[in-house]
């Protein structure tokens, strides 16, 4: 089709990448082609099988972006109109367990890819950053970044993502940066520390749901379908930073656990664990994290459609 828009999704076999792929194929107003490059470290091969129905419009390349030869990457990328860079090590528990590996990987990706994006000149890149950069807040795009204490390795992840943001801003290719706040939904793995899939998996199996600390930490969850819908809209803007999340239903983690048990009809019990029992000495938690969404709303009209109950039901 002459007017096909071709998208390259780096890390596209992951949780957000899969939903983004589906949302692109579901677009009514444009024909799309999607190519995914992913090393499948935090996703499974089945993630790519479901797009077989799109035949030659979907292509999956299993490769490690940090070691892929430059010319090979450029040759692939030049066939695409827009790039989503979602690749990277994720998850607070993953970062806590493998601090050096997650840091090196995220910085290696930046060092490798950003000069290549620069060579592509006019290809728009949307980079997935993180709400971790705000530390304890405030959570507005114009506020200062405020990562936590430098003695706690947890904040290395935020620092690597922030460094990547600066490297992108220092370049001359068109970009959009998004900071995701607690995006959740079907297909998300709990293995890396994402709280909702961990709770849902436990409830499904009538196992204990483990709440860390007092359970009074406050979070606000965004359905992945809302997140990828606005992510696509934002890929048509340039030079800006946006929060993506849902601020309508902040909830304490202990109440979230009770909600999951109630909605699932599970016989699970809720147990508590101290941070010391659960994590390394490098772990630090954020008490409250709720996004400021005024900027993304003003730019796109974004208002999340899915409630927290919707998210949990879709995951059950």
Where are the regions a protein language model picked out?
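N-terminal Rossmann/SDR dinucleotide-binding element
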Residues: 2-79
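SDR active-site strand-loop-helix element
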Residues: 10, 37, 83-87, 125-131, ...
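C-terminal substrate-binding subdomain of Rossmann-fold SDR/epimerase-dehydratase oxidoreductases
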Residues: 23, 182, 203-316
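A short helix->loop->beta-strand "cap" motif at the edges of active sites that frequently abuts
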Residues: 31, 120-124
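Conserved short acidic donor-positioning loop in nucleotide-sugar-dependent glycosyltransferases
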Residues: 39-40, 131, 247-248
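Helix N-cap/beta-alpha junction loops of NAD(P)-dependent oxidoreductase domains
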Residues: 45, 91-93, 136-137, 186
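NAD(P)H-binding glycine-rich loop region in Rossmannoid oxidoreductase-like domains
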Residues: 65-105
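Catalytic helix-loop patch of NAD(P)-dependent Rossmann-fold dehydrogenases
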Residues: 97-100, 104, 108-115, 124, ...
């Amino acid at each position: 089709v002459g007017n096909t828009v071709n998208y390259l999704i780096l890390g596209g076999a992951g949780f957000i990448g899969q939903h983004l792929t589906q949302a692109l194929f579901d677009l009514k107003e444009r024909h799309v082609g999607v190519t995914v490059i992913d090393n499948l470290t935090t996703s499974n091969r089945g993630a790519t099988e479901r797009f077989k129905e799109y035949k030659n419009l979907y292509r999956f390349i299993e490769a490690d972006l940090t070691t892929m030869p430059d010319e090979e990457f450029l040759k692939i990328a030049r066939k695409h109109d827009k790039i989503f860079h979602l690749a990277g090590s994720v998850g607070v528990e993953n970062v806590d367990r493998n601090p050096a590996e997650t840091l090196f990987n995220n910085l290696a990706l930046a060092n490798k890819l950003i000069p290549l994006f620069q060579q592509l000149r006019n290809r728009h890149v949307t980079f997935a950053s993180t709400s971790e950069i705000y530390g304890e807040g405030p959570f507005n795009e114009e506020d200062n970044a405020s990562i936590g204490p430098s003695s706690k390795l947890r904040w290395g992840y935020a620092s690597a993502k922030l460094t990547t943001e600066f490297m992108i801003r220092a370049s001359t290719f068109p970009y959009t940066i998004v900071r995701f706040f607690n995006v959740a939904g079907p297909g998300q793995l709990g293995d890396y520390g994402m709280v909702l899939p961990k709770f849902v998996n436990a409830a499904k199996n009538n196992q204990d749901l483990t709440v860390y600390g007092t359970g009074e930490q406050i979070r606000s969850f965004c359905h992945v379908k809302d997140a990828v819908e606005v992510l696509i809209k934002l890929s048509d803007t340039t030079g800006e930073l946006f929060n993506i999340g849902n601020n309508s239903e902040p909830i304490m983690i202990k109440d979230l656990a009770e909600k999951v048990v109630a909605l699932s009809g599970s016989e699970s019990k809720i147990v508590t664990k101290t941070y010391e029992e659960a994590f390394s000495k490098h772990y630090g938690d954020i008490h409250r994290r709720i996004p400021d969404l005024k900027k993304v709303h003003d730019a796109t009209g974004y208002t999340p459609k899915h409630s927290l109950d919707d998210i949990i039901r879709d995951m059950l």
